[in-house]
Amino acid sequence: MPDSAPEPHVADQAPQDNELTDYDREHFPTYLRLLDAETEGADWGEVARIVLQIDPSREPDRARRAWESHLARAKWMTKHGYQHLLRGG
């Protein structure tokens, strides 16, 4: 069985551009996982640890900021970013 691709490195802050970025394209699966976790009512700390690979017990502020910014970006993708994908961007 082939190994799955490694998770891409997660920045402390997701992009805030009004355009789709290379980071967004690379982290599209991460955004989907964050949206799924929110829908399921998962604890933010557990999501940060599992999805973003940041331990909230060791780095609570960093974990919270990364989770908040990436979840906000995931929501942006559902409202605006997907349009850039449809246009081939």
Region annotations inferred by a language model:
Residues 1-18:
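Basic, low-complexity segments
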